[in-house]
Amino acid sequence: MLHKLFMYEALREAIDEEMARDKRVFVLGEDVGHYGGSYKVTKQLHTKYGDLRVLDTPIAENSFTGMAIGAAMTGLKPVVEGMNLSFLLLAFNQISNNAGMLHYTSGGNWSIPLVIRGPGGIGKQLSAEHSQRIEAYFQAVPGLKIVACSTPYNAKGLLKAAIRDNNPVLFLEHVLLYNLKQEIPKQEYVLPLDKAQVVREGSDVTIITYSRMLHHVMQAVKQLVAQGMNPEVIDLISLKPIDLETLVTSVSKTHKAIIVEECMQTGGIAAEVMAQIYSHAFDELDAPIRRLSSKDVPTPYNGYLEQACLVQPTQIVEAVKTLMST
């Protein structure tokens, strides 16, 4: 049985099911309770589970993130919502020094089963401070898993897996994908956190991407196929750890790769993916890896300039054609 849900509804369904399944699961963050969350992911959950399991907090990311880590240390399973993931920079100390490292620094005595989730990425004129690509900042934190959903289907299955995981998971939801609608199973399903997905099989070139850029890539693929090319498309999903096996298998087949990301180029996810492929599949490559990233500038408020910062489908088409000609 299938039903059609928006992504924000699929995320809510995942949280609802996990709260019903495990009484240790609770939600906390700014306006997650009576207001239902900034994008309505937690709407009406406080009515069902009460104010102690859907906990409204003050506007103090460092405080409630630290509280969630402490709760996780005692055996609870907190799900933190960042009203905007850019604000998690205010809790960088708690996430890096506590959530990411406590299992190691305690000699394995502490586990931190914590999910930190919320809207991020470049939206519609949200300007610089609300358009951070935080995956670049957090990818170097030891002990932290990073997952980026791209569809209602994988959003639900991945969030359920993240809540059940015994490690801290940073769960990235793109602000412009909340209203993406898709048929998903009514019956329970859980997806692996550490596996990339081959979205489209092909033989000519491997296009690696994640989150909202998957949809830009798929627009470009329509044009490439119409021009006689057969690209393979991989949705990374797991940004940390990277599913290297899937990437190497694909590159060993196509012998050419291009990475498309919304992250800034300097220190971005693509830089790490390139390094991993070069380290493990260099001899399989017939050409240097290409990458398309956002500009290394603060995201402008002006709509035209904002779009100029982003990778567009036409740029992907041209980059793939150039790569194919080498």
Curated annotation (Swiss-Prot):
GO terms for molecular function: metal ion binding; pyruvate dehydrogenase (acetyl-transferring) activity. It comes from the Eukaryota. The keyword Chloroplast applies. Its cofactor is thiamine diphosphate. Its EC number is 1.2.4.1. InterPro entries: THDP-binding (IPR029061), Transketo_C/PFOR_II (IPR009014), Transketolase-like_Pyr-bd (IPR005475), Transketolase_C (IPR033248). It is found in: Plastid, Chloroplast. Pfam families: Transket_pyr (PF02779), Transketolase_C (PF02780). It catalyses: N(6)-[(R)-lipoyl]-L-lysyl-[protein] + pyruvate + H(+) = N(6)-[(R)-S(8)-acetyldihydrolipoyl]-L-lysyl-[protein] + CO2. One of its GO terms (cellular component) is chloroplast. SMART domains: Transket_pyr. Heterodimer of an alpha and a beta chain. The pyruvate dehydrogenase complex catalyzes the overall conversion of pyruvate to acetyl-CoA and CO(2). It contains multiple copies of three enzymatic components: pyruvate dehydrogenase (E1), dihydrolipoamide acetyltransferase (E2) and lipoamide dehydrogenase (E3). This is Pyruvate dehydrogenase E1 component subunit beta. It comes from Cyanidioschyzon merolae (strain NIES-3377 / 10D). The lineage of its organism: Eukaryota, Rhodophyta, Bangiophyceae, Cyanidiales, Cyanidiaceae.
